[in-house]
C-alpha cells in the first residue's frame, strides 16, 4: 500500500510543519518579512525557488501562498535543526504508529548531524544529505503521515489515531462494531492551528493552490512539488470546509506534472463533500 508503505519527499506540503513550528515556538509570525530572491546561498550552497522566481520582500504568509523556498530556507536556519525536528516529531515524524497494515515511519534527520544547508532545504520539504551522515535524510513521509498533519491543523491541533475499519455489520445487517475516535497527540495549540489554517486558505484563494477551489466551500491547503532525478512528484494536502473540516485529503501523483496533485485533490474533496451532504 503506497499510502502507508512508501516514503516520499513531501516537498512544499512540509511547509505546513515548518510554519506551524515557527508560529507555535514564536520563531516568526505571519507578518514577519523576509527577502525572497530566486536563489540564495545558505551554508555555502544554493537554495532556489521554483523556476528561480524572485518575489522581492514577502511576509511569511505571502511566502506560504507562493511557496517560496528561499524564505523557508531562511526560516529553517533561524529556528535551527533542533526546533525543526522537534516540530516535525510533534506531528508524528520519527514516531512508530500501531496500524493494521504496514506503516513506514516518517523520518527526520538527527539534528546534530544536519548542516545549515540541509536544515534550510528540510524546512522547505526537500531531504538532502550532503555529508552522508548516519541518520536518514529528512523529511521523508508517507502519504498518510501528511494527511495526519493536515488533520491536526484542521482539528485545532489535535491529531487523531487513524483507523481503516469504521464499522462491522453482522448477517442481519446489524452493526456489531463501531470505531471510536481516539486522540493520538496534541501537535500544536488551537490558536496556532487557526492561524495556520488562515494562511492555507490564502494558498487556495490566491496562491499556488487555486485549482483546489470549490464553489460555495472554503478550502485550505498546501501544494508541493518534490524534485527527483528525472521527474517530480506532485502533492497537495487540503481540508474543507476550512474552519470546520469534514474532509482532509493528501494526494501525491508520482512523476506528475506541476499542479496535477491539486487538481486531483479538488475532485476528491468535492466528491467527499457531496457524499457528506456538505455541498
Predicted regions mapped to residue ranges:
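Generic structural signal for hydrophobic residues
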Residues: 18, 83-84, 265-268
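Intrinsic structural disorder
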Residues: 230, 243-245, 257, 271, ...
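Short, gly/Ser/Thr-rich active-site loops of penicillin-recognizing serine hydrolases
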Residues: 175-180, 265-279
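Short, charged, low-complexity patches
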Residues: 146, 258-269
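Beta-lactam-recognizing serine transpeptidase/beta-lactamase-like catalytic domain environment
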Residues: 1-6, 20-253
Amino acid at each position: 500500500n503506497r499510502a502507508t508503505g512508501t516514503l516520499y519527499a513531501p516537498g512544499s506540503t512540509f511547509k505546513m510543519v515548518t510554519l506551524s513550528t515557527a508560529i507555535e515556538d514564536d520563531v516568526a509570525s505571519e507578518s514577519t518579512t523576509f527577502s525572497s530572491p530566486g536563489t540564495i546561498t545558505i551554508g555555502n550552497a544554493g537554495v532556489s525557488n521554483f523556476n528561480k522566481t524572485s518575489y522581492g520582500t514577502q511576509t511569511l504568509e505571502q511566502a506560504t501562498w507562493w511557496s517560496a523556498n528561499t524564505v523557508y530556507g531562511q526560516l529553517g536556519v533561524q529556528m535551527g535543526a533542533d526546533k525543526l525536528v522537534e516540530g516535525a516529531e510533534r506531528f508524528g515524524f520519527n514516531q512508530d504508529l500501531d496500524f493494521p497494515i504496514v506503516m513506514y515511519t516518517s523520518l527526520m534527520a538527527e539534528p546534530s548531524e544536519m548542516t545549515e544547508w540541509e536544515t534550510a532545504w528540510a524546512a522547505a520539504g526537500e531531504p538532502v544529505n550532503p555529508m552522508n551522515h548516519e541518520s536518514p535524510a529528512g523529511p521523508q513521509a508517507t502519504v498518510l503521515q501528511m494527511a495526519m498533519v493536515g488533520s491536526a491543523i484542521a482539528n485545532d491541533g489535535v491529531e487523531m489515531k487513524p483507523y481503516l475499519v469504521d464499522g462491522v455489520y453482522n448477517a442481519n445487517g446489524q452493526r456489531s462494531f463501531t470505531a471510536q475516535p481516539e486522540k493520538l497527540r496534541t501537535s500544536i495549540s488551537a490558536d496556532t492551528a487557526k492561524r495556520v489554517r488562515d494562511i492555507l486558505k490564502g494558498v487556495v484563494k490566491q496562491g499556488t493552490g487555486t485549482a483546489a477551489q470549490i464553489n460555495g466551500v472554503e478550502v485550505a491547503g498546501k501544494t508541493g512539488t518534490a524534485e527527483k532525478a528525472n521527474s517530480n512528484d506532485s502533492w497537495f494536502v487540503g481540508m474543507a470546509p476550512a474552519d470546520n473540516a469534514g474532509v482532509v485529503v493528501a494526494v501525491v501523483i508520482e512523476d506528475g506534472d506541476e499542479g496535477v496533485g491539486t487538481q486531483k485533490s479538488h475532485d476528491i474533496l468535492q466528491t467527499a463533500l457531496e457524499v457528506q451532504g456538505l455541498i
